[in-house]
């Protein structure tokens, strides 16, 4: 999984009946797992015939007499008076084995028919039973329980926290419990400063809170595998849905320029869809990881990596693509073989190979550096100056779509954010774009503007993706 919170079926301890909640120790600063242990006195219905357990369970479930506590199996083993092991069913906490007044008509009926016998049962609960939310709620101060820290990002075996200041005194406790409760996690880190505060490569300073000091991860996304040192590249698991959304806008055989490609979360999945991509990133380690991902996911024919400055890459790549030698990728159909013999299965008629010819113009530009990507738009004016005859209306070739990621202030009225984004884009490309230019709006429909709300980064910070067709006045401008 790519991002996570506490397990969806893990209720907060306040949702459990009092008698099933863990012991409380709000002075704990070093995790003591042995402290979290308690015995809960219950009653159980011992079933005389083990073969009758399913029927009795169904009847007691229907009468709502069974114990209903998340993650607890109500079927238990008990010994009868002769020492024989029998199956028993734990009953709801209000039922008392020695008080018939607490028995339902169904329990009384089953006892009278000799199908069950009422027995006391001491249920032992320990640290392994309770969830992260249960345990941490028994440690944090009561005034911090309204919003316990349980939003995290998982990258491979690493859990990445971004703890608020009030939880820092408990950071090691939080990390240890999270590692215990998520078996695939081996390392827990906490971001100590904002992304990019110390590096132009969008990495961030962190502290190790629990587990191994090993950030070499294996990450899967869109059926692709990426291997990288999480401390040296940018990766955000919360963006998988957005990566998928944009890649789905690209068509087979199209040409994409991924200007700030990172390790390739757009480029490599696009290559798998038989989309040509020139993918660039300034980070040398990110470039190396992208090279590995291209090879590992077998998209060498479609994805070409570069290690350049983004602004330089925008201008250079447009000219280079137009002048470089043509490329054709041939995909031969897979040979079908008989499962038993392994022999080749003849197909009539035999399927033809697929051929994909790399375009000489980009159909899409992707600019996924939300903090500063809009600033790089000033590389587009004049990008195809003097090449007007190669584009519509003279040919069928349209100017490219630009997909630029950015942050805005998360206004109460989203239109204010859209106005802000359009103004910033307009300033950089020297051409006015307004929210009315959106598809179906009252403005300039040739712009094909759409502004997609990607995610809320913080209460006052929203991430957007603005997509628009590069205006002819910009592309052909003489500069």
From Swiss-Prot:
GO cellular component labels: cytoplasm; mitochondrial matrix; nucleus
Any single Pfam family the record assigns to this protein: TYW2_N_2
GO biological-process terms attached to the record: mitochondrial tRNA methylation; tRNA N1-guanine methylation
InterPro entries linked to this entry: MeTrfase_TRM5/TYW2 (IPR030382), SAM-dependent_MTases_sf (IPR029063), TRM5-TYW2-like_MTfase (IPR056743), TRM5/TYW2-like_N (IPR056744), tRNA_Gua_MeTrfase_euk (IPR025792)
Molecular functions per Gene Ontology: tRNA (guanine(37)-N1)-methyltransferase activity; tRNA methyltransferase activity
Top enzyme category: transferase
Major localization listed first in the record, in broad terms: mitochondrion
Localization per Swiss-Prot or TrEMBL: Mitochondrion matrix; Nucleus; Cytoplasm
Gene3D superfamilies, alphabetized: Met-10+ protein-like domains, Vaccinia Virus protein VP39
Key words, A-Z: Cytoplasm, Methyltransferase, Mitochondrion, Nucleus, S-adenosyl-L-methionine, Transferase, tRNA processing
Record: residues binding S-adenosyl-L-methionine: 243, 281-282, 309-310, 368
Domain of life, source organism: Eukaryota
Keyword ATP-binding: no
E.C. numbers: 2.1.1.228
Catalytic activity annotation: guanosine(37) in tRNA + S-adenosyl-L-methionine = N(1)-methylguanosine(37) in tRNA + S-adenosyl-L-homocysteine + H(+)
Quaternary state and interactors: Monomer.
Function: Specifically methylates the N1 position of guanosine-37 in various cytoplasmic and mitochondrial tRNAs. Methylation is not dependent on the nature of the nucleoside 5' of the target nucleoside. This is the first step in the biosynthesis of wybutosine (yW), a modified base adjacent to the anticodon of tRNAs and required for accurate decoding.
Family: Belongs to the class I-like SAM-binding methyltransferase superfamily. TRM5/TYW2 family.
PANTHER family, per database record: TRNA (GUANINE(37)-N1)-METHYLTRANSFERASE (PTHR23245:SF36), TRNA METHYLTRANSFERASE (PTHR23245)
Protein's name in the database: tRNA (guanine(37)-N(1))-methyltransferase
Organism: Aspergillus fumigatus (strain ATCC MYA-4609 / CBS 101355 / FGSC A1100 / Af293) (Neosartorya fumigata)
Lineage of producing organism: Eukaryota, Fungi, Dikarya, Ascomycota, Pezizomycotina
Gene: trm5
């Amino acid at each position: 999984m790519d991002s996570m919170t506490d397990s969806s079926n893990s209720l907060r301890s306040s949702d459990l009946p009092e008698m099933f909640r863990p012991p409380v120790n709000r002075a704990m600063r070093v995790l003591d797992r042995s402290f979290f242990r308690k015995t809960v006195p219950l009653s159980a219905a011992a079933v005389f015939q083990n073969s009758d357990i399913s029927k009795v369970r169904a009847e007691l479930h229907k009468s709502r007499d069974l114990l209903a506590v998340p993650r607890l199996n109500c079927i238990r083993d008990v010994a009868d008076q002769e020492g024989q092991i029998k199956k028993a069913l734990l009953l709801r906490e209000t039922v008392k084995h020695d008080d018939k007044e607490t028995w339902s008509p169904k329990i009384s009926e089953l006892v009278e028919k000799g199908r069950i016998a009422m027995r006391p049962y001491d249920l032992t609960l320990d640290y392994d039973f309770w969830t992260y939310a249960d345990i941490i709620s028994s440690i944090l101060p009561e005034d911090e329980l309204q919003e316990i820290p349980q939003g995290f990002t998982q990258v491979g075996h690493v859990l990445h926290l971004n703890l608020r200041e009030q939880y820092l005194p408990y950071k090691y406790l939080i990390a240890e419990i999270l590692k215990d409760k998520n078996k695939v996690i081996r390392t827990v880190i906490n971001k100590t400063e904002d992304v990019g505060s110390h590096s132009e490569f969008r990495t961030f300073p962190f502290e190790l809170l629990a587990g191994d000091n090993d950030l070499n991860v294996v990450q899967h996304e869109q059926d692709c595998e990426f291997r990288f040192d999480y401390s040296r590249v940018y990766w955000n698991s919360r963006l998988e849905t957005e990566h998928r959304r944009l890649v789905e806008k690209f068509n087979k055989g199209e040409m994409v320029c991924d200007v700030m490609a990172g390790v390739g979360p757009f480029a490599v999945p696009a290559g798998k869809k038989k989309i040509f991509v020139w993918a660039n990133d300034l980070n040398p380690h990110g470039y190396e990881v992208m090279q590995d991902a291209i090879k590992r996911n077998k998209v060498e024919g479609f994805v070409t990596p570069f290690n350049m400055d983004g602004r330089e890459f925008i201008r250079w790549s447009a000219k280079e693509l137009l002048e470089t030698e043509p490329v054709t990728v041939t995909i031969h159909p897979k040979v079908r073989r008989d499962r038993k013999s392994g022999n080749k299965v003849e197909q009539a008629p035999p399927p033809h190979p697929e051929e994909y010819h790399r375009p000489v113009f980009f159909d899409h530009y992707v600019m996924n550096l939300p903090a500063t990507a809009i600033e790089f738009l000033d590389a587009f004016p004049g990008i195809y100056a003097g090449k007007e005859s190669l584009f519509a209306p003279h040919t069928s070739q349209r100017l490219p779509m630009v997909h630029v990621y950015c942050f805005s202030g998360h206004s109460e009225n989203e239109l204010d954010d859209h106005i802000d984004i359009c103004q910033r884009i307009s300033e950089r490309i020297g051409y006015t774009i307004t929210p009315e230019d959106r598809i179906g709006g009252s403005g300039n429909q040739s712009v094909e503007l759409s502004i997609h709300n990607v995610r809320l980064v913080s209460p006052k910070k929203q991430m957007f993706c603005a997509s628009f067709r590069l205006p002819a006045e910009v592309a052909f401008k003489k500069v």
